[in-house]
Amino acid sequence: IKMPDEIRSRYGLPLIGLIRTETDVRKGLDRWIERMRKSRWGSGDTEENVGAMISAMNLPRLLLCMEGVGEKLDITAKEVCVHAGCLTLSGSLYQNGDLVANAKESDGIILIVEIGGTDYITVERELEICRMQDVTVKGVVAIG
């Protein structure tokens, strides 16, 4: 996934939050591209804000499913779970059948994806499993 807008346009899912994790100072063309991204998408949300938005849904049994692998994704997902007490962190549904059973019993799932780190096939497989098992996808949290 290259841009947060793709989540809405390609999959029709609401974007709950965009968490910016890049803190390095870029130079030259990369710096200009980063400024253009910030002007289009904003500066991003904090983990506390995203946790508060998820808590405001008033759904006590939500699963936060991580799509992809990476230290940045793992750390940010744990921070969001801390700030949203209603969340349970899990991996991808297509990797574990027990997670599918947990997702069916929950109020829904929220996908957490990494911009530039999560591929389309992973998200599409996850959404296909959710459609087959009647699991509601409440939205997506993007990390970039």
Model-derived regions: residue spans:
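Short boundary/hinge segments that flank catalytic cores
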Residues: 1-91, 115-144
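Inter-motif core of Ras-like GTPase G domains
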Residues: 96-116
